[in-house]
Design a protein with these regions (language model features):
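Bacterial Sec-dependent N-terminal signal peptides
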Residues: 1-21
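Surface-exposed, flexible loop/turn segments at secondary-structure boundaries
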Residues: 12, 99, 164-166
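Structural motif
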Residues: 72, 129, 159-161
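Fold-level recognition of mixed alpha/beta catalytic cores in primary-metabolism enzymes, strongest
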Residues: 150-168
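Intrinsically disordered, low-complexity segments enriched in glycine/proline and serine/threonine
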Residues: 5-6, 124, 168
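Acidic/His- and Gly-rich active-site-bordering loop/insert found
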Residues: 19-126, 133-154
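Phenylalanine-focused residue identity feature
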Residues: 11, 15, 52, 118, ...
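Residue-level micro-sites within transmembrane alpha helices that shape
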Residues: 1-2, 130-133
Length: 168
């Protein structure tokens, strides 16, 4: 997971602060949280335009980091704005937060048992294509970057996109 966090920052335009021994400690310190968030989001999936609990979790986390938060973007989306302490460009990082009307067929302890309405039918819902992981990683990247705000040149937008798979 740490390698994914580092890669996300490297490819996001945050290269200048993505390296160094101090940040390695930050990545390592947050790794367990990211895994926990991913499992919680996986176990509690929400279909597109219904990601109310997911959006609330994201917004609370970003606010706890001192990141400016806008909710209700595209109905259930969340955007966080982290202004670095030095002038510079704006970089956007994005994660999709919706799940799919698909049954989960495994025995993981954090398996989804959530049901939702899709096209008038009650259906099983799960994160079948990684949106839970994308969301958890971006929450982790936000935490590391907020902690290192003094090293950031410019502004970072954290975009948590709802209904990427299309409305149910």
């Amino acid at each position: 997971m740490k390698k994914v966090l580092i890669a996300t920052m490297l490819f996001s335009g945050c290269f200048a602060i993505a390296q160094g021994p101090d940040l390695q400690k930050d990545y390592t310190a947050i790794e367990g949280k990211v895994v926990e968030w991913r499992r919680d989001i996986h176990q509690n999936p929400e279909l597109g335009n219904r990601e109310f609990k997911t959006a609330e979790k994201i917004a609370k986390h970003l606010e706890s980091l001192g990141i400016e938060v806008k909710t209700g973007v595209a109905y259930t989306g969340v955007v966080g704005l982290l202004k670095g302490e030095q002038p510079g460009k704006v970089v956007a990082l994005r994660a999709d937060i919706d799940a799919l009307p698909v049954p989960e067929r495994n025995d993981l302890p954090y398996k989804s048992t959530v049901m939702g309405e899709f096209m008038g039918n009650e259906v099983p819902v799960m994160h079948a294509c990684g949106h839970d992981t994308h969301t958890a990683i971006l929450m982790g990247v936000a935490e590391v970057l907020a902690k290192n705000k003094n090293k950031i040149k410019g502004t970072i937008k954290f975009i948590f996109q709802p209904s990427e798979e299309g409305p149910p």
